[in-house]
Amino acid sequence: MKRISFILSLFVMLVACSASLDNADYIPGPNGSGSDGTSETEPDVIADNQIKVISFNVRTSTGDKNTSNAWDLRKKAIPPMFAKENPTVFGVQEARENQMSFLRSQVAGYEGIGVGRDDGKTAGETMGIFYKTSDVELVKWGTFWLSQTPDTPSKGWDAKYYRTATWAVFKHKPSGVTFMYVNTHLDNAGKLARQNGLLLIRDKIIEYNTGNWPVILTADFNSTTDDPIFDSVKGLMTDARTACPVTDKYGSYNGWGQSNSVIDHIFYRGFNGISFHTVRDVYDGVQYMSDHYPVSAVLQVQN
C-alpha cells in the first residue's frame, strides 16, 4: 500500500517551486568572489531530527593544470570546509579516483561510496556519496548509468559523456529514520540526455524506494529549475532553494569568478525544508575551492 501511495504522489503532489530561477535574479559573491576573510572553524550543529546535505561539484582534477585553479592548489580548502559545514551526508560530482581518495582520507569522520563512470570501477569521474559514520548507517547502495542500458557502463541519448547516478539508503541514528539519497550529474551538452536522464532517475527512485522512505536528490543538473526537464521531478520532490524559509540568491556555478549560473540543486521529499545555503566562504586562503560553490540544505524529519 505504501508503494502505491508513493507512485500516486507523482501525480497528485503540488509543485512547490513555481518561481523561475532567472540568472539575472542571482548574484555572485562580493566582487565576483567568495566571502571576505577566512571562515570560522566551529562546526555547525543541527537538531537530532534534522539532516544536513551538501552537493558539491569539485571540478575534475584533470582540468586547470599549471594554473592557479589546479586541484593540488585548491584541495587544501575542502577538508576545513566540510569540518565547518558538518553535513550528515554529501554528494560530489566530477571526482576522479585521486579526488575520491583524498576526500576519504582527509575529510575526517566520513566514508565514501561510488564507482567510476567509465568502467564501473575506478576509471573516469565518480558521483560519490559520503556519509558521517557517527550519524548514519549505510543500509545499501548502488550505481546506474543514465542511458538506455542503465546496468552497464554506457552513454545515453545525445550525451557527450558517460553519466551515472549513485544511490544509497541510510538509517539516521539520532532520529531512527531511514532515508534514500541519490547523487548525479546531468550531461552538459545533450538536452535529451538531461531530460531522459532525469526521467530515469525518477523511475529508479520509485523502483529502489521499497520502503517509501524520505528521499534527497542532489546534482549538478546543468540546468536552471525553470527548464521543462524538471517537470517530472517537481511532481515528486521539492526544490530546497525555493521552498526553504531561510535561503539565499547566490549563483552556484562561479566559473572561477566569471559566472553566477544556478545549476546545482537539492531536491527532497518526505522532509520539511529548514534552510538552504550557498557556501561561498574562503578557507586557507583559497578563493575558489572549485568552479562551483557547494550548496547545502538542512532538512527536518517529518513526524
Where are these regions (language model features)?
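Short, solvent-exposed loop/turn segments at secondary-structure boundaries
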Residues: 65-69, 155-156, 192-195
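Solvent-exposed loop/turn segments at secondary-structure junctions
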Residues: 58-62, 95-99, 117-121, 135-136, ...
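Metal-dependent phosphoester-hydrolase catalytic domains
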Residues: 29, 37, 192, 196, ...
